[in-house]
């Protein structure tokens, strides 16, 4: 072998050296022998919540780095069976600690595998994307994000203003009771608007009782906040639609999510 070629090969091997162990959640059934977190090798630590592509048997699947690696997470000597991660979806922000805590609670409560619940909570189409495909999707231009207020506001009635003030007075659940046409939706709109004005990083989740009611409510929210700020997520959408909405919400581009 030419000395120059040998030198290049040595540099590549050094770059790909597995110097860290990652604990990764993958989609396996609770009764499987692989139901817990799986260990993979990586060149460097990755933040918890990072989405990665990992080998699983003869397949390559999506996984989630679950725990921060301990200080002694270096790959022990003499462990050639530790498989390396195949890729990192570095263009996608890690799934935050609150999301991971909710998934862990659901897995314990329903006695399911952690990865089984975690991966099922992500859009189905996301599970098939590699790093290059994800980068291309995120480079696609999205809808412009206008200001929080896009329509002229109507004056609230005394009852509506009272309900709005009570909701802002303290945290906790509230029941807004009123007959059809009494103006409940406008109170919801104002409360969401107040939240988004008060905290530039805040997002609002609005739950709708039925899928067929979503388009009508979405029209109201889009008229108030703009199309780039509002997305819907429900089982009546196609996989590409669900992925597009999820990416907009996860990236913070969409600040309001309508769900069922």
Q: Residue spans of the language-model regions?
A:
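Accessory, non-ATPase domains that flank or precede helicase/AAA+ motor cores in DNA-metabolism machines
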Residues: 1-260
């Amino acid at each position: 072998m030419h000395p120059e070629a040998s030198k290049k090969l040595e540099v590549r091997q050094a770059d790909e050296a597995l110097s860290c162990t990652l604990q990764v959640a993958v989609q396996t059934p609770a009764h499987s022998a692989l139901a817990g977190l799986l260990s993979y090798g990586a060149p460097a630590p990755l933040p918890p919540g990072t989405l990665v592509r990992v080998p699983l048997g003869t397949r390559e699947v999506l996984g989630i780095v679950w725990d921060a690696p301990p200080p002694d997470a270096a790959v022990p000597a003499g462990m050639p069976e530790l498989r390396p991660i195949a890729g990192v979806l570095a263009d996608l922000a890690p799934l935050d600690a609150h999301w991971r805590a909710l998934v862990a609670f659901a897995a314990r409560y329903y006695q399911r595998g952690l990865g089984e619940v975690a991966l099922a909570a992500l859009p189905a189409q996301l599970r098939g994307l590699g790093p290059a495909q994800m980068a291309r999707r995120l480079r696609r231009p999205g809808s412009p994000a206008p200001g929080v207020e896009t329509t002229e506001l109507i004056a609230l009635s005394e009852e509506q203003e009272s309900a709005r003030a009570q909701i802002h007075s303290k945290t906790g659940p509230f029941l807004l009771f009123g007959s059809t046409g009494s103006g409940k939706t406008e109170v919801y709109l104002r409360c969401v608007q107040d939240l988004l004005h008060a905290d530039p990083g805040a997002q609002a989740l609005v739950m709708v009782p039925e899928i067929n009611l979503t388009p009508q409510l979405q029209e109201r929210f889009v008229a108030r906040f703009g199309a780039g700020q509002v997305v819907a997520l429900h089982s009546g959408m196609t996989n590409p639609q669900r992925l597009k909405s999820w990416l907009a919400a996860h990236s913070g581009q969409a600040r309001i999510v309508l769900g069922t």
